[in-house]
UniProtKB/Swiss-Prot annotation:
It is an enzyme of class 7 (translocase). It catalyses: a ubiquinone + NADH + 5 H(+)(in) = a ubiquinol + NAD(+) + 4 H(+)(out). One of its GO terms (biological process) is ATP synthesis coupled electron transport. GO terms for molecular function: NADH dehydrogenase (ubiquinone) activity. This is NADH-ubiquinone oxidoreductase chain 2. It comes from Mycosarcoma maydis (Corn smut fungus). GO terms for cellular component: mitochondrial inner membrane. The gene is ND2. Core subunit of the mitochondrial membrane respiratory chain NADH dehydrogenase (Complex I) that is believed to belong to the minimal assembly required for catalysis. Complex I functions in the transfer of electrons from NADH to the respiratory chain. The immediate electron acceptor for the enzyme is believed to be ubiquinone. The lineage of its organism: Eukaryota, Fungi, Dikarya, Basidiomycota, Ustilaginomycotina. Its EC number is 7.1.1.2.
């Protein structure tokens, strides 16, 4: 799988500067998506290796391949391919008619996607402090460049600069944590660190105190750095500005792919902490380090649930609203991760998978709305948002007024995605939240369960606000008058553009998964159950 990604990466590095004038950026994206799909198939094929159950160390122990890491690698690469396949804006007829209405495609986009995918897959299997830091930086640097690819857009460049500066701060925290752990233990491999601290903790209190403070503080710094990168509250302030400033096609990547790799890495780190750090105590208290780690995740979970829901109520820009929605979902993921039982890990994996698919489908639908609206009404959609160089982006919720009448299937698909995010039965999002809440109540976290239920009810209001705008609000006729008075070219009704067949197939397939999951839930649920058991019994 890594070999396939490396071959694709090297091929693009050579092809983009040599053939960029003869090969369109869309073709580069299609080639990259094929590489990602083939790599995902290779990853899934590796699940048949029996020795993966207990894990296999590769590259001198820098990476530790397990069943969970291989399965999530395949899912991550497959999800990345879905996002890339949604790039093709409209039909070739519209592209030939005018190039001003099409998203400005950039050949380097596919190259940055491969760099990010490479870093994410390496992070999933990292078992060493060095490989962990290099993997997260490979993923992060590519994402920083990805956020600023649209250098002619003031909002995109400012968002990318903010992302780079604050992301560098989180990387510095992670590096400081690794330095503390290495200075107190002299080791970089996670398994060796777990074993050393467990052995020294059983000798005497004096020997244990030598390692406890530094190692625990180092772990806390690493955890805070990763929570910063997944936009967990109260370290979330950068996320709404960045997600709203960059183009939608980039936002769809930022909100999904980096989070998958980081959350699964935290899952494997959590399993190691549970098994080997029970004897480690803080120098300023009697709580064990696993309790401190769990409290860190629980505090971030509660704050993410509350802030992501309450602040999202006042948003009128759709990508900022979805950013706060993402923060709220991060709270559910952290809650399931902190409980760390078989049931909670199963719910964690299931929630991560369903949220990724639902989130990707939501942004694919927003892209489709933007493509169709910008070409079917006028070439001056930037009048709605003059600061955006990307004229096909949906910036405001009000831009979706009356779209159910214009595009009923897209409107229905978006409504189903929003209902799933709100946790309305019988959609897939309901079962994900139900599993997290069941595991939290079964583990005795009743207060957190009540908070999660309340914020789920409250968050449904801003999802319903979008649905109300799509279904019941009428379009503003003054907008058409402004476009006409500007003497712009308006497309005739018989010349209305459509999205590509691949784009529509992706939307319909993901929507069917969201809706029809209830008819055959055992496929995904059994897979998550087996992955969760592999962490506890191997």
């Amino acid at each position: 799988m890594l070999v396939m990604l490396s071959i694709g990466l090297i091929s693009l590095l050579v092809a983009i500067p040599v053939f960029s004038y003869r090969i369109t950026p869309n073709l580069f994206n299609r080639i990259t998506s094929v590489v990602l799909i083939y790599s995902a198939l290779l990853a899934f094929n590796g699940l048949h290796i029996e020795s993966l159950a207990s894990g296999v160390g590769i590259y001198s122990g820098l990476f530790h391949v397990t069943t969970v890491s291989v399965a999530i690698e395949g899912f991550l690469l497959f999800t990345g391919a879905l996002i890339l396949l949604g790039w093709g804006p409209v039909t070739e007829k519209t592209i030939a008619r005018s190039s001003t209405t099409v998203v400005p495609t950039i050949s380097e986009y596919s190259l940055m996607i491969l760099f990010t995918s490479m870093g994410a897959t390496l992070l999933l299997s990292s078992s060493d402090l060095v490989s962990m830091y290099l993997s997260i930086e490979l993923q992060s640097f590519a994402v920083y460049i990805l956020a600023t690819l649209y250098r002619d857009s003031e909002s995109a460049t400012s968002a990318g600069l903010k992302y780079f500066l604050l992301g560098g701060l989180s990387s510095a925290l992670i590096l400081l944590g690794t330095a503390l752990i290495y200075s107190y233990t002299g080791l970089t491999q996670f398994e060796s660190i777990y074993t050393l601290v467990q052995v020294t903790g059983s000798d005497s209190a004096a020997n244990s105190a030598t390692y406890s403070g530094g190692v625990t503080c180092g772990l806390l710094l690493i955890g805070i750095g990763f929570l910063f990168k997944v936009a967990a509250a109260p370290l979330h302030n950068w996320a709404p500005d960045v997600y709203d400033g960059v183009p939608t096609i980039v936002t769809s990547w930022l909100t999904t792919m980096p989070k998958i790799s980081i959350f699964v890495f935290l899952l494997e780190l959590q399993s190691g902490l549970e098994g080997s750090f029970e004897s480690l105590s803080l120098i300023f208290g009697d709580e064990t380090s696993i309790d401190i780690w769990k409290n860190l995740l629980l505090i971030a979970s509660v704050l993410s649930l509350i802030i992501g829901t309450v602040v999202g109520l006042s948003q009128y820009r759709i990508k900022r609203l979805l950013a706060y929605s993402t923060i709220s979902h991060v709270g559910f993921l952290l809650l399931a991760l902190a409980i760390n039982t078989e049931e909670s890990i199963e719910s964690f994996l299931f929630y991560l998978i369903q949220y990724s698919l639902t989130n990707v489908n939501t942004f694919l639908i927003l892209l489709a709305f933007g493509y169709i609206m910008s070409t079917s009404k006028s070439y001056l959609l930037e009048n709605v948002n003059k600061q955006s160089v990307n004229s096909t982006d949906i910036q405001f919720i009000d831009q979706l007024k009356g779209q159910f009448k214009e595009n009923p299937l897209l409107g229905l698909s978006l409504a189903l995605c929003l209902f799933s995010m709100a946790g309305i039965p019988p959609l897939i999002g309901f079962f994900a939240k139900q599993m997290v809440l069941y595991s939290s109540t079964h583990g005795g976290y009743y207060f957190l369960s009540i908070i999660a239920i309340l914020v789920s009810v409250i968050s449904a209001s801003y999802y319903l606000k979008i649905i109300r705008v799509i279904y019941f609000d009428s379009q503003d006729t003054q907008t058409d008058i402004v476009y006409t008075s500007a003497s712009t070219h308006t497309v005739n009704s018989s010349d209305t553009p459509t999205i590509t067949n691949v784009h529509s197939l992706l939307i319909s397939s993901l929507t069917m998964i969201i809706v029809l999951f209830v008819l055959q839930p055992s496929i995904l649920l059994n897979s998550c159950h087996i992955l969760a058991l592999s962490l506890f019994y191997y």
